[in-house]
Amino acid sequence: MPNAISQVRREIKHTGSMKAKIVILLYRLATMYRSRNPFYKLLGIPFVILNKLINECLFCVELPWQTRIGYGLRLYHPHCIVLNRGTVIGENCILRQGATIGSLTDSEGREGASPVIGNNVEFGAHVVVIGPVTLGDNVKIGAGTVVTKDLAAGQVVVGQPFRVLSTHREV
């Protein structure tokens, strides 16, 4: 737990606006509800409620406590961001306003698989990532792009339907 506290402190320090700091802090505190430790689980209950009330109702940012997000998350202009509870996001990712990351439902209303996103992925404004897709590490997605297929590590994509602009490799 001390390691998690220092990571959250570092994460909040490197996030820009006060609104983004509040959103991330409430989300991280709400994730205590996932703990197997009964004390942390109990401690997480009020933060699950605050996450719902403040982040979703007041700030229009849906980061469910079930969503798995690595440390280093940065939110630029955190408004109208929607993440599905089954989504998995790696470390050091950037989300901008209007980002939607979620699953598809079938004709009977059953929820399908959610996206799995690597480390150091950057989302432009109003990006939509939908369905059982995997985004590799160091992917960059341009504003307004809809992603419905897997992206390899290092790809830069834009447009609808998206097209790959380049593939960069980590040096």
Regions found by a protein language model. Give the residues of each.
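Terminal amphipathic alpha-helical/low-complexity segments used for targeting or macromolecular assembly
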Residues: 1-59, 171
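Left-handed beta-helix
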Residues: 65, 70-71, 76-79, 84-85, ...
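Short beta-strand-to-coil "C-cap" segments at the C-terminal boundary of structured domains/repeats
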Residues: 166-170
